């Protein structure tokens, strides 16, 4: 098969060192390159290969390969070199540089790799949004919670959390942490007396809570609980996924760490999975060391997709805030709705807290239909615009019945967490409010 070689970027800039780099590039027909690029969009593991092949084919600055001098250096055209940043490994310019990087400060080699994988730019943007000293991005929001808990809670430690919590996080706490001798106190989100009692009677390492919480959108006074925790030597970690960094900056209110599922608002397009932990550099560095040993690395294509999503984060969240508030107000007045949970409503028990620490109330509205399990299920089936899925925060509206989607247990088990048969969680997208309202009305009229 014929080959073609390309000169190095340095030679284009007038480098007369005489050492032209060369690379053997398989000469596929243009149609194959297009097909490979299309397939790569469906399979992110091939995206780097597709980009390099396509870039090499399209680059017209081909030169004859120089075999003289007895030296061969790996290289491609400038376009292909740029594309190769979206690969799964970091490449060293010189073999001799590797020992120096290894012997340097622990973060030196990792920094080079993060830059190539795209996560370095991502982490800097997130740190700026959260006003954090440092951020580490990982493969998922769940892994972010696991890495944080595994790093900051010592064996034999004690944690405090709330009844309203992402279910898989709770399952991990209940099943995995006891294997390390870690005990746990679970409190109601608004029960500050129970929090103080737990802090007074246990050697608490960490208080971990969401705010707003899932699915009832309860709000914890971050400044208050941070003072309570710090007075007893405990850390405070806030899962701020339901708020997004646009609406809430927990670190400025006293939290030590903030966790996000970047899958939700941050990426915002329901097409990528990722998570992040932000906070003081001292704490994030500990998580980063654990992360580099255990794995859970955010792949390069995911980094790109999240960076893309962050370009419109503020626009999307502002739109979702506005539409969700209008939807909550509308639902609260509808005769077929028994109750609405939304921190932007004066009827919400922590509305005053939300107003004091949030600039917007988020795009998720939870509510209870005036009906039973079956009528609620039918309502979900009748809506036409929202997708039926267990996620939130994206451009598309999503609706689900937690009793089916997340808590498919016995009714007695659901009652422990307050999950009623008629509960609905509605994640507002960027669709027009009137379109969403009319869709909800027609579905309610059928039950």
Which ranges hold each PLM region?
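Conserved C-terminal alpha-helix-loop-beta "cap" of PLP-dependent enzymes
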Residues: 14, 27-30, 336-424, 428
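Residue-level signature of catalytic and energy-coupling elements of molecular machines
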Residues: 126, 210, 320, 379, ...
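Aromatic- and Gly/Pro-rich amphipathic surface segment
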Residues: 97, 113-131, 139
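Conserved PLP-enzyme active-site core in the AAT-like
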Residues: 2-16, 21-25, 99-102, 107-108, ...
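Conserved N-terminal helix/loop that builds the PLP phosphate-binding region
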Residues: 54-57, 63-116
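PLP-dependent enzyme catalytic core of the Aspartate aminotransferase-like
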Residues: 1-24, 29-30, 34-47, 51, ...
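A common structural junction motif
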Residues: 295, 383-391, 443-447
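Hydrophobic side chains in well-ordered alpha-helices
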Residues: 122, 287, 375-379, 436-440
């Amino acid at each position: 098969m014929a080959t073609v070689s390309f000169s190095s970027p340095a030679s284009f800039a007038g480098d007369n060192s005489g050492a032209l780099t060369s690379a053997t590039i398989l000469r596929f027909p243009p149609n194959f390159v297009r097909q490979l690029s299309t397939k790569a969009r469906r399979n992110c593991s091939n995206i780097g290969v597709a980009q390099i092949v396509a870039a090499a084919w399209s680059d017209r600055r081909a030169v004859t390969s120089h075999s003289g001098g007895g030296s061969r250096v790996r290289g491609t055209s400038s376009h292909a070199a740029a594309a190769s940043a979206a690969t799964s490994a970091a490449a060293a310019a010189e073999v001799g540089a590797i020992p120096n990087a290894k012997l340097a400060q622990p973060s030196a080699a990792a920094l080079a790799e993060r830059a190539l994988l795209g996560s370095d730019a991502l982490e800097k943007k997130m740190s700026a949004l959260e006003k954090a000293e440092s951020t580490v991005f990982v493969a998922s929001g769940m892994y972010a919670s696991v890495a944080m808990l595994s790093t900051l809670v010592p064996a034999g430690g004690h944690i405090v959390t709330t009844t309203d919590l992402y279910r898989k996080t709770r399952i991990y706490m209940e099943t995995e942490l006891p294997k390390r001798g870690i005990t746990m106190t679970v409190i109601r989100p608004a029960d500050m007396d129970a929090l103080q009692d737990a802090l007074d009677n246990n050697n608490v390492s960490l208080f971990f809570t969401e705010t707003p919480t899932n699915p009832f959108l309860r709000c914890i006074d971050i400044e208050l609980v941070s003072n309570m925790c710090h007075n007893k030597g405990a850390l405070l970690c806030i899962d701020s996924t339901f708020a997004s960094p646009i609406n809430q900056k927990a670190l400025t209110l006293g939290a030590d760490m903030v966790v996000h599922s970047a899958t939700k608002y941050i990426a915002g397009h329901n097409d990528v999975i990722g998570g992040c932990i932000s906070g003081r550099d001292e704490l994030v560095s500990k998580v980063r060391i654990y992360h580099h040993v255990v794995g859970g690395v955010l792949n390069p294509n995911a980094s790109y997709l999240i960076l893309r999503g962050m370009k419109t984060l503020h626009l999307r969240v502002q739109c979702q805030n506005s539409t969700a508030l209008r939807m909550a107000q509308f639902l609260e007045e509808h005769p077929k709705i028994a109750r609405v949970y939304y921190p932007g409503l004066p009827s919400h028990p922590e509305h005053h807290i939300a107003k004091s620490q949030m600039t917007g109330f988020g795009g998720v509205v939870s509510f209870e239909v005036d009906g039973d399990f079956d009528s609620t299920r039918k309502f979900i089936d009748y809506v036409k615009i929202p997708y039926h899925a267990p996620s939130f925060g994206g451009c598309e509206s999503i609706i689900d019945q937690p009793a089916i989607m997340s808590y498919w247990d016995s009714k007695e088990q659901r009652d422990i967490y307050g999950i009623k048969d008629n509960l609905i969680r509605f994640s507002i997208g960027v669709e027009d409010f009137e379109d969403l309202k009319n869709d909800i009305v027609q579905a309610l009229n059928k039950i």
